[in-house]
Amino acid sequence: MSDFRIIEEKWQKAWEKDRIFESDPNEKEKFFLTIPYPYLNGNLHAGHTRTFTIGDAFARYMRMKGYNVLFPLGFHVTGTPIIGLAELIAKRDERTIEVYTKYHDVPLEDLLQLTTPEKIVEYFSREALQALKSIGYSIDWRRVFTTTDEEYQRFIEWQYWKLKELGLIVKGTHPVRYCPHDQNPVEDHDLLAGEEATIVEFTVIKFRLEDGDLIFPCATLRPETVFGVTNIWVKPTTYVIAEVDGEKWFVSKEAYEKLTYTEKKVRLLEEVDASQFFGKYVIVPLVNRKVPILPAEFVDTDNATGVVMSVPAHAPFDLAAIEDLKRDEETLAKYGIDKSVVESIKPIVLIKTDIEGVPAEKLIRELGVKSQKDKELLDKATKTLYKKEYHTGIMLDNTMNYAGMKVSEAKERVHEDLVKLGLGDVFYEFSEKPVICRCGTKCVVKVVRDQWFLNYSNREWKEKVLNHLEKMRIIPDYYKEEFRNKIEWLRDKACARRKGLGTRIPWDKEWLIESLSDSTIYMAYYILAKYINAGLLKAENMTPEFLDYVLLGKGEVGKVAEASKLSVELIQQIRDDFEYWYPVDLRSSGKDLVANHLLFYLFHHVAIFPPDKWPRAIAVNGYVSLEGKKMSKSKGPLLTMKRAVQQYGADVTRLYILHAAEYDSDADWKSREVEGLANHLRRFYNLVKENYLKEVGELTTLDRWLVSRMQRAIKEVREAMDNLQTRRAVNAAFFELMNDVRWYLRRGGENLAIILDDWIKLLAPFAPHICEELWHLKHDSYVSLESYPEYDETRVDEEAERIEEYLRNLVEDIQEIKKFVSDAKEVYIAPAEDWKVKAAKVVAESGDVGEAMKQLMQDEELRKLGKEVSNFVKKIFKDRKKLMLVKEWEVLQQNLKFIENETGLKVILDTQRVPEEKRRQAVPGKPAIYVA
């Protein structure tokens, strides 16, 4: 790849020298495209490479389509991860040293110097800038910034004053993900594991021990099923009895630890062996029915309270566990449980759906569940049943006051009533585990008092976001439903913390705005950053009045100039820039940000800006794995952008990552495939270089075929790129055209240069360096700024395409037959009889068998053949659009030499030498073939 790297560096320097990707307002239609700025606690990796390359390919495509494209990027450094990393390096943490030297490619001597957040930011921002330039992104680097810049902090302060004025920031008590070591709420960027974990609210239902005051608090997501409880499950291990707000609770050790992070008054009383309670009874709240306590190994003591209520009619796991226990005489004997206690347990149906009988029983039977070990099948049954009952279920008469209610309503009502009556409570838990902070500590759910929260549960705010979502373009479109659901479920979110890098809350300086909350409207800051980096705008100029005017159009420019100490002309120029560029036309991002950043991006734009400045489109791409393994920047394996470019070159890296999977699918980086692609790209380069400057002679049918194929490719690529389908686009622009060109050259084509201008331009967004090098063999302009090829239907030659497809199919068929004939010397070819050609032409244009036959029977020759014509029409009708209607005799005679060269056989056009049975099978476009 060394020669490719020379080419790449040459054009990167030229682009930078001539500043061709610096964008300012002009008379063209604008296109403002952004990608998430990377977090600088490590080197950029293949995940960044994918998201950023998709963004860059689209930016280049839109630029060549004639748009004035703004494609900027900054660097994200706020929050705790960088501080945590500096501490770990300062402590010479072995695992950290290994990860950063082995996976992030940081030389040990450099790494050991990175003992402060400032040094880390300086090092990785320099590395990131170098990597981003080395892969050839068409970014306007005048607008780069980091989120600890003083000017950026003024911008964030302005944003948060706006949100506070709107009543969208509140102080309250909420459950948050929390690191006990850092004593801080944590967000996705702060985590080593569990980035997608959300906080789930369980209903705790208090089952009191019969003849006692000990409470067995069962945590459930389905409080409405309390009427169907037949027993409770406890794991045969050590639990604790704790005093919780004056009550005695029986909970797992893990649950006790979690309770200490709530607002409850909690005190440990004693540890107990759970087995001493097996066979005893508890009272079911509301219905006052007694049910037994039974052992279950499946109970997860690290999930909620570690005590589980059993509803076998509506919970497939419970039903399977009860049936297993009935057969497990050893366990029953071990804990002194009378078998009759378990035998007497019968499911209690309490929800009506279209499932007859006991719903859990029916699903278990249908799925073939044999025992509780069939976890996947039971998971499937549970999800199916819960979804059906939640959306369509009606509570039956045995559910007291809740009879006749929809399950979705009863769930809320039962929860409220249990809590009101003192029979229920709330327990917060993670949706998935483990959740590990970057410092290595296991996180908990903590109920935090007097914390600043973004009021995302505000119904009016949600409705505005939901209404705008319907007007937006989401790519792929099925993600719109996911956005809708996540917006509906989004709750108030802690937006501040006491430790980390970042901007302090302007009205409460003890708190710092956390890293997901200071990165929601920074796309607007790119407009300001150009002036900041030019030295025309400083932090002291960025008064609230200035930002109100340039970003919202509020105020009078003269007064703003006075307050900000800037000229009226400069302020107006910045305002005009903002008016020209905003809103963001496309935000292209990885799918990991759908549940957080992209939601907050929508909420904050809708809150702060007028509707005409709200985002227009969001595109969501999948993850990247490495040789089938999930990548991790904190644990490995990892492929850095820098290493990929050094090893394979920029254009190979770009082409591969764009073609590895369609936009919304996950991609897998496979070194062997990358090396194969590098060879393909080299062949393309050499092919164009050898043919580009050749004179184009008189055009043949074969040349017209090549031009036609190029037009098909142009149409396909444009359609694909308009929908951000980069795999489809690269496939058409590179791989399929390479196949066509190979065929063209096999056929003896000599005018390849006729398509090379279009081909170079077509491929330029994907492999810009090689295309720039080739383009300059003939032109002085930058191909990156040329017009993208337009589809021209008048240059499509369907007849030429049919001829080449006919020949390709014929050669392949002969070669296939030849495999089964030893010592083959000749091939006899017999095209279909004339009457079949005549019939096929009618059938090809007909939409109805009857109509076709009616028309054909008007022909005297065909009428004589009667039944034979009828059978033939039926045979070809289904695939009539695929019929290869060419002048076969003429095509064969003109291409005898080619067929002979390709097959190594002497071609004889003699129908009589082909066996009659084979001749009868011939159809137009698919002649009878006999190899001898």
From Swiss-Prot:
Principal place of residence: cytoplasm
Localization in the cell: Cytoplasm
InterPro entries: aa-tRNA-synth_I_CS, aa-tRNA-synth_Ia, Leu-tRNA-lgase_arc, Leu-tRNA-synth_Ia_arc/euk, M/V/L/I-tRNA-synth_anticd-bd, Rossmann-like_a/b/a_fold, tRNAsynth_Ia_anticodon-bd, Val/Leu/Ile-tRNA-synth_edit
UniProt motif 'KMSKS' region: location: 630-634
Family indicated by similarity: Belongs to the class-I aminoacyl-tRNA synthetase family.
TM helices/strands, residue ranges: none
SUPFAM superfamilies, sorted: Anticodon-binding domain of a subclass of class I aminoacyl-tRNA synthetases, Nucleotidylyl transferase, ValRS/IleRS/LeuRS editing domain
Protein known as: Leucine--tRNA ligase
EC category: ligase
Domain of life, per lineage: Archaea
Family matches, as PANTHER family: LEUCINE--TRNA LIGASE, CYTOPLASMIC, LEUCYL-TRNA SYNTHETASE
GO cellular component: cytoplasm
EC number from the UniProt entry: 6.1.1.4
Gene: leuS
Example GO biological process: leucyl-tRNA aminoacylation
CDD domains: Anticodon_Ia_Leu_AEc, LeuRS_core
PROSITE patterns: AA_TRNA_LIGASE_I
GO MF annotation, one: aminoacyl-tRNA deacylase activity
Catalyzed reactions: tRNA(Leu) + L-leucine + ATP = L-leucyl-tRNA(Leu) + AMP + diphosphate
Pfam families: Anticodon_1, tRNA-synt_1
UniProt keyword list: Aminoacyl-tRNA synthetase, ATP-binding, Cytoplasm, Ligase, Nucleotide-binding, Protein biosynthesis
Keyword Zinc-finger assigned: no
Binding locations of ATP: K633
Motif ('HIGH' region): 38-48
